[in-house]
Amino acid sequence: ITCSKVYGDIISCVGYIKGGPIACVGYLKGGPLQQYVHN
């Protein structure tokens, strides 16, 4: 599952299906951030 880039600084992204929306966890330079995107 691919996730949208945030500020183009996402190093890695793990996605999983959760109740319809895709919950993505991306790790930035400063730390983790959680974003929700729809496929």
Swiss-Prot record:
Signal peptide: none annotated. It comes from the Eukaryota. GO terms for molecular function: lipid binding. The keyword Disulfide bond applies. Keywords: Disulfide bond, Lipid-binding, Transport. The keyword Protein biosynthesis does not apply. Belongs to the plant LTP family. Plant non-specific lipid-transfer proteins transfer phospholipids as well as galactolipids across membranes. May play a role in wax or cutin deposition in the cell walls of expanding epidermal cells and certain secretory tissues. This is Non-specific lipid-transfer protein.
